[in-house]
Amino acid sequence: MLRNFFFVVMCLLVFPKCMLAQAVAEYPKKVHDFGVVAENSDSVECEFKVANVGDKPLMIEGVYVSCGCTSATYSKEAVAPGDSAVVYVSFFPKDLDGRYLKTIYVYTNTVPRKNHVRIKALVVPPGKEK
């Protein structure tokens, strides 16, 4: 009887920790401001770090951009607990004008599954960027 009781107590102590173990994504920087960019620029780039502060491997399952003037690439490798990955973002201001706020959606195996980072820029005619 005591043996069964001990087994039940151990299960109650161990199993909840296993069930709660998960990857947790942390984004140290959620917005990147490119500032003033000339509309004849080829592209401007930035990086967003995705840190795994959980205790299970983190997978970036997909990265989606909100418009054709933006692209993003990322590593498809699992991110170990304590490590981080980088999402590389490019903004193409060619033939654009004005203020831009673009959203990049990052899907991971975390809760919540969908997160986002943003880029900002003020696109001006060539020679007016100063």
Language model features with spans:
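Sec-dependent N-terminal signal peptides
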Residues: 4-15
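Short, hydrophobic beta-strand segments
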Residues: 87-95
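Buried hydrophobic-core signal for structured, non-transmembrane domains
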Residues: 46-52, 89, 102-107
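Short, acidic/polar linear motifs in exposed loop/turn regions
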Residues: 53-56, 95, 110
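Sec/Tat signal peptide C-region and signal peptidase I cleavage site
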Residues: 15-21
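Surface-exposed binding patches on compact interaction domains or structured appendages
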Residues: 55-86
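Beta-sheet-dominated interaction scaffolds and their linkers
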Residues: 21-53, 126-130
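Terminal connector regions
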Residues: 97-127
